[in-house]
């Protein structure tokens, strides 16, 4: 983990209020799929850092891509960044996805919902490079919210569900996965809690890893703002930022 400044290479709005931010910096060397960065807004009245998941990285070029949706003052501040600007970053943080499971999977199902889609990209890329057959299932509210289908298609098959039916299957990600003829060897998922609950319930016998989305204040486990109950003892809790954000589905109570 480093507290450092990263330089903006490029920023583009790629969907409705969703931005692709390309950064460069030394901290890229320590990144792994499923981790996140804590970004500090430039405005002096915005004291808290914002957690942004890592979409992809290139360790040789020392660049990474973050995808985020503008939802408040902090992310609105980030959306004003342009080429050559710098941003104060803490990271990479958290425990990411386990891609070295034993036995090695032949098939992997990657399920993302909304702004939970970005971490699926680098994960799918690295799994595909290991020879795993990758299936992406992405869920969005509408076609205008959809992104990265073309990029993901380089590493696996892509299925899209939209609530309003404007793109792909009308409904939710589970309306797609319930029609798959065979269960995958492993499932990785990131998105809203309701979606993760549905994924967990749909595949009770499949090895499943869930990346939890929680509001975070410190990002390093000091403030207990992002706790999640343990499945085996509801009196004990995980700190999502430090113990996760990725957990086995059987570890957590959603």
Curated annotation (Swiss-Prot):
Pathway: Pyrimidine metabolism; UMP biosynthesis via de novo pathway; orotate from (S)-dihydroorotate (NAD(+) route): step 1/1. Keywords: 2Fe-2S, Electron transport, FAD, Flavoprotein, Iron, Iron-sulfur, Metal-binding, Pyrimidine biosynthesis, Transport. The keyword Electron transport applies. The keyword Metal-binding applies. PANTHER family: DIHYDROOROTATE DEHYDROGENASE B (NAD(+)), ELECTRON TRANSFER SUBUNIT, DIHYDROOROTATE DEHYDROGENASE B (NAD(+)), ELECTRON TRANSFER SUBUNIT-RELATED. Heterotetramer of 2 PyrK and 2 PyrD type B subunits. This is Dihydroorotate dehydrogenase B (NAD(+)), electron transfer subunit. It comes from Listeria monocytogenes serovar 1/2a (strain ATCC BAA-679 / EGD-e). The gene is pyrK.
